[in-house]
Amino acid sequence: MEARRLLEGSHYEPRTLRVICEGFEKAWDEISSHFGAEPRSIEEAQIRLAHACLAVARDGSDDPERIKIDALQVMALAYRERG
């Protein structure tokens, strides 16, 4: 999965990276039904979500729920701006 490689290739320390990945999984569980069954659409959405998770994370982040909430807000804002 490209999104997972993107997350794992980031510069964060291992503990923070685990929190980011957990936040990503929680967020994906919440929104996955909005992207249908087409593999390309799913992959694109997961990549956007991974970027959103990385954008809101900070070194030392320790709350996957906060990563989830903030990343979903970034995604929602991006979709609103796209029209």
Where are the model-predicted features located?
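Short, surface-exposed loop/turn segments at secondary-structure junctions
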Residues: 35-43
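Short, charged, intrinsically disordered terminal tails
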Residues: 3-12, 75-83
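Charged, alpha-helix-enriched surfaces in structured cytosolic catalytic cores
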Residues: 15, 19, 44, 62
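N-terminal acidic leader/helix
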Residues: 4-33
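Short, compact, well-ordered microdomains
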Residues: 56-82
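Amphipathic alpha-helical segments that form the core helices of the histone-fold
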Residues: 42-58
